[in-house]
Amino acid sequence: MGHLVSAVETAKLLLSRCHSLSITVLIFNNSVVTSKVHNYVDSQIASSSNRLRFIYLPRDETGISSFSSLIEKQKPHVKESVMKITEFGSSVESPRLVGFIVDMFCTAMIDVANEFGVPSYIFYTSGAAFLNFMLHVQKIHDEENFNPTEFNASDGELQVPGLVNSFPSKAMPTAILSKQWFPPLLENTRRYGEAKGVIINTFFELESHAIESFKDPPIYPVGPILDVRSNGRNTNQEIMQWLDDQPPSSVVFLCFGSNGSFSKDQVKEIACALEDSGHRFLWSLADHRAPGFLESPSDYEDLQEVLPEGFLERTSGIEKVIGWAPQVAVLAHPATGGLVSHSGWNSILESIWFGVPVATWPMYAEQQFNAFQMVIELGLAVEIKMDYRNDSGEIVKCDQIERGIRCLMKHDSDRRKKVKEMSEKSRGALMEGGSSYCWLDNLIKDMIK
């Protein structure tokens, strides 16, 4: 979902800046496409101009054994859809096909773009430093037979282009250690060099060192690309009314993304930390019983079954425990003073945009790297646990969580001031003459020349 929203917002940005462009978004239609995705796409169709179209590809799941096979299976459908688009627009007055923008995990679609004789651009939803990291890991894997699993088991450090500090083995991202995900990640990364450029959801002021370290492929840091208008306030009145009653910057918001959940034992430690900290809190709590491959956890039907006995009564007046949360609306609210987060890149960009400090608690994907970058490299976050993995069985104890929350909520900290300053820079990057504004100009010129 996060990739789709960022891609659509990028499409809108391109259309607003270049009136000769039209964009068609092709969406995989498989069993893990949730009602939230369909509702989001429907809302975009209703509000978008005819220059932005959405097409669901045919549902075809026969013989799919991995994510890579899912992508390969879609190639004929993508080709057929693009052929129909170009045939429909084959008159002299109609726009020509100028290129493909493909998701960072869908580089197999470069083959389809090549068949049409047009360039491809990678849409990269993580940060520039992580792209540098992946290119470096791919290089030393291919040239030196680097094994990230062995590196993770050591106390070693890795020198990565784009990072000022040495990268510690303990922060090796979960995705790199996964036998399921590492091979396709490597293959995708190898293919980035075949693209004409990489569009990155970041901005120069946030990742200047990483961006300046790039040589190839060409990059376009055009972010932060966020959907901050559809903030969910109107459909989540109870949550927003509760926040309205809280003092400014007083609430700790705990939210771990669409796939973030904890065991009952870990939930009890978090509850203990929140109670002991004494801070007001809004906690988005998802059921740990994962439904299956790539599916998001659901909300608890009864919170009493997972929370400590008497917890809700003892914290009455300063707490609100919820299921799914309208994260953008909560971060935008003046009562929110800090975010305890899984360190997903979209969440990091949203917290920076609204000037809300983060306490890192990474869980999966590249989030351990993001946590290292935010805490050590950029000094924009505090650490609860930088090397946590949701499949490790580790339990982070109450006192460690409480320390992180107390540090997060310090109102006069230098870190909070740095986040506020970076918030202003994130907004300035998108304004006329700003860094991302200029990079987007360069991208458009490259596309339509």
From Swiss-Prot:
The gene is GT1. In the presence of other necessary color factors, this glycosylation reaction allows the accumulation of anthocyanin pigments. The active site is at residues 3, 103. The keyword Glycosyltransferase applies. Belongs to the UDP-glycosyltransferase family. Gene3D superfamilies: Glycogen Phosphorylase B. It comes from Manihot esculenta (Cassava). UDP-alpha-D-glucose binds at residues 125, 325, 327, 342, 345-347, 350, 366-367. PANTHER family: GLYCOSYLTRANSFERASE (PTHR48048:SF45). Expressed in cotyledons and roots, but not in leaves. An anthocyanidin binds at residues 3, 365. One of its GO terms (biological process) is anthocyanin-containing compound biosynthetic process. Keywords: Glycosyltransferase, Transferase. Pathway: Pigment biosynthesis; anthocyanin biosynthesis. Its EC number is 2.4.1.115. Pfam families: UDPGT. It comes from the Eukaryota. It catalyses: an anthocyanidin + UDP-alpha-D-glucose + H(+) = an anthocyanidin 3-O-beta-D-glucoside + UDP. This is Anthocyanidin 3-O-glucosyltransferase 1. It is an enzyme of class 2 (transferase). GO terms for molecular function: anthocyanidin 3-O-glucosyltransferase activity. The lineage of its organism: Eukaryota, Viridiplantae, Streptophyta, Embryophyta, Tracheophyta.
